[in-house]
Curated annotation (Swiss-Prot):
Record's catalysed reaction(s): ATP + H2O + 4 H(+)(in) = ADP + phosphate + 5 H(+)(out)
Native source organism of the sequence: Pediococcus pentosaceus (strain ATCC 25745 / CCUG 21536 / LMG 10740 / 183-1w)
UniProt-listed Pfam families: ATP-synt_ab (PF00006), ATP-synt_ab_C (PF00306), ATP-synt_ab_N (PF02874)
Listed name of the protein: ATP synthase subunit alpha
PROSITE patterns from the UniProt entry: ATPASE_ALPHA_BETA
Residues annotated for ATP binding in this entry: 169-176
EC number of the protein: 7.1.2.2
Coiled-coil annotated spans: none
Entries under HAMAP family matching the protein: ATP_synth_alpha_bact (MF_01346)
Subunit structure and binding partners: F-type ATPases have 2 components, CF(1) - the catalytic core - and CF(0) - the membrane proton channel. CF(1) has five subunits: alpha(3), beta(3), gamma(1), delta(1), epsilon(1). CF(0) has three main subunits: a(1), b(2) and c(9-12). The alpha and beta chains form an alternating ring which encloses part of the gamma chain. CF(1) is attached to CF(0) by a central stalk formed by the gamma and epsilon chains, while a peripheral stalk is formed by the delta and b chains.
Length: 505
């Protein structure tokens, strides 16, 4: 077989014509320091703030400090495999997390990686962790109620869809319980819930996930967990990752409830990062931009205008206080950013008033706009009555000679406190809340012993469901209070048959 020279030259020419030179330019730097979740690198002169960088072992980091000689990088993951002298390269991308329906029912870390052992998350959608909050014209005023199922909140400090309501109190006063009960109450409410656990013990998060699963709430919930053993950057990033996951649903016209449990630990993680990055410390050693850290997060919660689909994201940030001191730096910051706060009192909690909500210092700046008309009517004077009872109660301790009007107020106040108590993980429907609050404010409980109030309430609900179901149906469907004569007749009929316990006071 003879090889022709012309064929060879033609083949070479063809190969040369088809050859495409690919020049792949990567800007790289050298790690000069690593430790405590932070790295410094020299040589990345064109790196951008917030840009994602890749280390030689595949771990990613985010540019946080831009200095004259080097860049400060927060490491997103385990930094044990990163050493001085390692190569780090720019990616040209910003920090993103996976989003979409595939995350619902899953437990993930702030990078969107699964923690529940159920395999990879099947989604190709991602969103930037940092995103600009909706502007004034992109928003709509909060008008739809978000029912928490907790009487004391829905009646006294109502929350609306798109609101930011701070839950504040000392440790072990029931903050997380309020969040879990609120999530449980969103069943069949067309709401997607995101629970962001920041610095919570992994055993605690496991317990919360099991509770949500037991009550069927994981069918519409995403859990984002950054445990206390994680590096500080993961704790700092967790709420932003949760917000990005929520925005995907909000901008698609859906309604989202996001719980940040809690922002005190995120602030501590950010303080740690900033001090290691040698940023100048301010009050309580927090960096100067700690207010902006929280404001840019919480401003992402909104009720969107109809032009943008009318979706909403409601935020319930938690802040832990020390000995009830709400004048500390982080509590005052977050109070000024949010649309109200629910203050939990340790003394109330220890005395058995649970949820331990202090009606005097709790407020919702959205107010009655976030209540159905029926609830607005029955709960109108409740807050004032409770505040005057607390005041009278403290004075009544010093003297026994009280006139009948004062004694009646104290008796009604004790029954009000008892009605607002609620067992763990038993959120109430809004129609049942309206029924019991109507009975309270119209004097039907005045002759019921305080110890029997909870039994009276439970039996009243059963009685109404069996004999006067049309009343609760009307409240649920029309959001209005039914005819008061019918309400009075139904409750009076039940009260006449109710048998108090002999030992009850």
């Amino acid at each position: 077989m003879s090889i022709k020279a012309e064929e060879i030259s033609a083949l070479i020419k063809q190969q040369l014509e088809n050859y495409q030179a690919e020049l792949n330019v990567e800007e790289t730097g050298t790690v000069t320091y690593v430790g405590d979740g932070i790295a410094r690198a020299h040589g990345l002169n064109n790196a951008l703030s917030g840009e994602l960088l890749e280390f030689s072992n595949g771990v990613f980091g985010m540019v946080q400090n831009l200095e004259s000689n080097d860049v400060g990088i927060v490491i997103m993951g385990n930094y044990d495999g990163i050493h001085e002298g390692d190569v780090v390269k720019r990616t040209g991308r910003i920090m993103e997390v996976p989003v979409g329906d595939a995350l619902i029912g899953r437990v993930v870390n702030p990078l969107g990686e699964p923690l529940d052992g159920k395999g990879a998350i099947q989604t190709t959608k991602t969103r930037p962790v940092e995103n600009k909050a909706p502007g004034v014209m992109q928003r709509k005023s909060v008008e739809q109620p978000l029912q928490t199922g907790i009487k004391a909140i829905d009646a006294l400090v109502p929350i609306g869809r798109g609101q930011r309501e701070l839950i504040i109190g000392d440790r072990k006063t029931g903050k997380t319980t309020i969040a879990i009960d609120t999530i449980l109450n969103q069943k069949d409410q067309d709401m997607i819930c995101i629970y962001v656990a920041i610095g919570q013990k992994e055993s605690t998060v496991r317990t919360q996930v099991e509770t949500l699963r037991r009550y069927g709430a994981m069918d519409y919930t995403i859990v984002v967990s950054a445990g206390p053993s994680e590096p500080a950057p993961m704790l700092y990033l967790a709420p932003y990752a949760g917000a990005a996951m929520g925005e995907e649903f909000m901008y698609n016209g859906k309604h989202v409830l996001i719980v940040y449990d809690d922002l005190s630990k995120q602030a501590d993680a950010y303080r740690e990062l900033s001090l290691i990055l040698r940023r100048p410390p301010g009050r309580e050693a927090y960096p100067g931009d700690i207010f902006y850290t929280h404001s840019r997060l919480l401003e992402r919660a909104a009720k969107l205008s109809d032009d943008l689909g009318g979706g909403s994201m409601t935020a319930l940030p938690f802040v832990e206080t020390k000995a009830g001191d709400v004048s500390a730096y982080i509590p005052t910051n977050v109070i000024s950013i949010t649309d109200g706060q629910v203050f939990l009192d340790g003394d109330y909690f220890n005395s058995g008033t649970r949820p331990a909500i202090d009606a005097g210092t709790s407020v919702s700046r959205v107010g009655g706009d976030a209540q159905i008309k029926a609830m607005k009517k029955v709960a109108g004077t409740l807050r004032l009555d409770l505040a005057s009872y607390r005041e009278l109660e403290s004075f009544a301790q010093f003297g026994s000679d009280l006139d009948k009007a004062t004694q009646a107020k104290l008796a009604r106040g004790r029954r009000t406190v008892e009605v607002l108590k609620q067992p763990l993980h038993q959120p109430l429907s809004v129609e049942n809340q309206v029924m019991i609050l109507y009975a309270l404010t119209h004097g039907f409980l005045d002759n019921v012993p305080v110890d029997d109030i909870q039994r009276f309430q439970d039996e009243l609900f059963d009685y109404i469901a069996s004999n006067n179901k049309e009343l609760t149906d009307e409240i649920r469907e029309t959001k209005q209070l039914p005819d008061t004569d019918k309400m009075d007749a139904a409750i009076k009929s039940f009260a006449e048959h109710f048998q108090p316990t002999k030992e009850a006071k």
